[in-house]
């Protein structure tokens, strides 16, 4: 029987077989830990990370009171960095997580900041 983490990893592998980031439309990958949330814009063809943001960054303000607020700030930061590099369209990779809570807040903040997906 699979536990929660193994099920998430299995879902993520299943999704990763279907989507990949290109230089024109890179992949916005999200990882969530107990305390922090991370977002990267990845070009899978070249195997490079173009932009990244997380709650551990120096430019991240520790003013976020809750995890959802922190995810919203990270989504805005990663979108702003991507737009500064000329990236407007991405493919959203939720990393096998359910589209709810912190993942949803990050995605909606990135959309509000101007990223298209």
From Swiss-Prot:
Which domain of life, per UniProt? Bacteria
Which Pfam families does the UniProt entry name for this protein? Ribosomal_L18p
Q: Name one GO cellular component term.
A: cytosolic large ribosomal subunit
- Which keywords, in A-to-Z order, does the entry hold? Ribonucleoprotein, Ribosomal protein, RNA-binding, rRNA-binding
> Which biological process annotations from GO are given for this protein?
translation
Name a GO molecular-function annotation.
Answer: 5S rRNA binding
Q: Does the entry feature the keyword Ribosomal protein, yes or no? A: yes
Q: What does this protein do?
A: This is one of the proteins that bind and probably mediate the attachment of the 5S RNA into the large ribosomal subunit, where it forms part of the central protuberance.
Assembly and partners are described as: Part of the 50S ribosomal subunit; part of the 5S rRNA/L5/L18/L25 subcomplex. Contacts the 5S and 23S rRNAs.
**What protein family is recorded?**
Belongs to the universal ribosomal protein uL18 family.
Name of the protein this chain belongs to: Large ribosomal subunit protein uL18
Q: Say which species the protein is native to.
A: Clostridium acetobutylicum (strain ATCC 824 / DSM 792 / JCM 1419 / IAM 19013 / LMG 5710 / NBRC 13948 / NRRL B-527 / VKM B-1787 / 2291 / W)
């Amino acid at each position: 029987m699979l536990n929660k983490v193994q099920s998430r990893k299995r879902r993520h592998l299943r999704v990763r077989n279907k989507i990949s980031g290109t230089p024109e439309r890179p992949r916005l990958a999200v990882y969530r830990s107990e305390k922090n949330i991370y977002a990267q814009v990845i070009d899978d063809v070249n195997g490079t990370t173009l932009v990244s943001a997380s709650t551990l960054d120096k430019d991240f303000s520790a003013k976020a009171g809750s995890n959802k607020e922190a995810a919203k700030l990270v989504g805005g930061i990663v979108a702003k960095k991507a737009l500064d590099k000329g990236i407007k369209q991405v493919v959203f990779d939720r990393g096998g997580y359910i589209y709810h809570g912190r993942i949803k807040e990050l995605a909606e903040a990135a959309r509000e900041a101007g990223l298209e997906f």
